[in-house]
């Protein structure tokens, strides 16, 4: 049974091509092998995730605190329950903190997970323990699309 569980853990997020996944539990070896798209946010409480992640196609980065970004762009600093809308799906290279917190909040709503509740209650302690896993080619493609849109806007003016 334990070997079976380890195998299940090992295959998580292999060959991921899109979407968003949040991992609150342990990962197995070779996480992200063949991951060409999408984003994974992994809770790395013990700081050992990098040793289990296949870094051939992905980069790991921290989930930054975004209060200043949200305040300057949307006037929503410190307010995750704001009444206005921020389209966090419009730019997958930004808004990580808000996106992650929203997903965990939905997880809590639908599952009553004790861990999700603890993470949200102690957000300032848990946020720095999350890593964003993003394929390098996916990031490059998103940056090219963003630059092209910006060029089209400038050209239209």
Region spans (language model):
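Intrinsically disordered, low-complexity terminal regions
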Residues: 29, 36-157
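Feature marks extracellular polysaccharide-active and adherence modules
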Residues: 8, 15, 24-26, 43
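Short "repeat-start/strand-capping" segments in structured domains, especially the N-termini
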Residues: 16-21, 34-40
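Single conserved hydrophobic/aromatic residue that forms the stacking wall/gate
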Residues: 1-13
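Tandem-repeat/low-complexity and Cys-motif detector
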Residues: 12-13, 30-33
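A short linear-motif detector with a strong N-terminal bias
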Residues: 1-3, 18-22, 109-111
């Amino acid at each position: 049974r334990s070997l079976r569980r380890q195998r299940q853990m090992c295959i998580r997020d292999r060959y991921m091509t899109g979407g968003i996944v949040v991992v609150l539990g342990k990962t197995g070896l070779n996480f992200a092998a063949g991951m060409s798209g999408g984003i994974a946010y992994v809770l790395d409480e013990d700081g050992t995730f990098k040793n289990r992640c296949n870094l051939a196609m992905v980069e790991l980065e921290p989930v930054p605190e975004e209060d200043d970004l949200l305040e300057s762009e949307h006037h929503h600093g410190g307010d995750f329950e704001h009444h206005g809308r921020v389209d966090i799906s419009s730019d997958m290279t930004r808004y990580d903190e808000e996106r992650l917190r929203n997903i965990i909040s939905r997880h809590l709503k639908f599952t009553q997970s004790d861990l999700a509740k603890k993470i949200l209650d102690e957000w300032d302690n848990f946020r720095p323990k999350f890593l964003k896993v993003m394929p390098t080619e996916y990031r490059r493609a998103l940056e090219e699309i963003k630059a092209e849109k910006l060029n089209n806007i400038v050209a239209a003016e």
